[in-house]
Amino acid sequence: MRAYCVFCNIVAGNEPANIVYEDDEVIVIQNILRWVPVMLLAMTKAHTTQTELWEEHIEKVGKIAHKVGAELCPGGYRLLSNFGYDAMQSQEHGHLHILGGTFLGHYVG
């Protein structure tokens, strides 16, 4: 756990969050941003970078993100990640965005 990491603090129960899914290794929470009706974040409970998430944990996190997306957005959903400043990655803790609940068009935001 990183004391400065908001996601680590959510996992530890030190910060509030609307938890959509949780197991021993993965958590899915509602994003505080509400650009579309379904806007979730899927991540490992252990602190990982975005690169570590994709290189070491994407199979498990991806399967769960797909399952949650399919359940909540039967008309379709989008999974994405931002890598680095230019892509507007705002949190160091690696995570996948699950977006849906409406027609997303070519881009969101």
What function would you assign to each model-found segment?
Residues 1-109:
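HIT superfamily nucleotide-processing domains
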